[in-house]
């Protein structure tokens, strides 16, 4: 069954003639993995029918199935796996009717996929590349020496076909397993973010960094050995030029070059795709934090204030004295008649008077919205108020107005996660971003 000689119609006819089919529900797949695990602990690699029944009993217990029909269901499962060429059955007259079972290459391949090859190992990849480099070095030297057809087949074609090509296939399989692992990590991250993104940030960071590190290790190892491997393949290819009888070797070298280029190229592309996904997740987290800081945090703060007597809390703040620059050269540039700060008493009385006046005005103006359940557009109301005061007082007036408005109610749009539009509140470029308050 050489990959160079079989065509698609021939493979279809071969599969139809041999009645190939694989049906592995979750229970049967677990049974097959249990057989592979127990078989790996044995030196002879053989299992009796009783041992298979015991393994099926463990699987049946794990799936919480009845124990009354274990023997019958185990026998059916064993026969089904023999029919699907996952197990080979050997019988002998010396064994008194007791059969011996061994895993087939198909069964080993399936269990290897689910058990043994799920973990990436940089050491394993380095050893594989080291073996490939040695095989290619010897094959290149043999190709440059030249010889008869037997020499080329034994010392060049055979190592390339049965050693180098198989290791390349193994590396390609490792990459494909990494592709599946990436999809699994993405599903885990999505599940974590959907449950509670605050608690999931650390777990997401760990999953992202681990996958990024594994991809980078894989690619660095491949790139470090890739140039040397390609150089030896080119040496073999140059040795076949002009020899019409070495077309099979030349085609094999070309296929290996293409496979190596594809492996290295896909490794870099996988890293680039993962970097894009990493940025997407971080952007989502930053957006969620900004939304929480600007929207949900305000709601939690209001609830904390309202429930203070049930759940008391303490607020600590720092208020350092301002540093005033009293140098002569600075004073000469100032045009104000008086420098420095106002006396604390005078400043407190002025600010307090404005606050009381605004509080009364806002309470009277907003009473209509609360009674009639009308939506309150904070941007429009704030613009009307600021037009009545000088520019120097706009910040204080806006702050008081916001404090009074949030005591009235909240905007249902705050919980949608969508940002509000920026609205101009004066003629000097000041803007406010707030949803319309519609829940009192």
From Swiss-Prot:
GO: which molecular function terms? Answer: calcium ion binding
Q: Which cysteines are cross-linked by disulfides? A: none
Principal location listed in the UniProt entry: cytoplasm
| Keyword terms | Calcium, Cell cycle, Cell division, Chromosome partition, Cytoplasm, DNA condensation
CDD domains the record matches: MukF_C (cd16337), MukF_N (cd16335)
Similarity remark = Belongs to the MukF family.
Q: What is this protein called?
A: Chromosome partition protein MukF
Q: Which organism is it from?
A: Yersinia enterocolitica serotype O:8 / biotype 1B (strain NCTC 13174 / 8081)
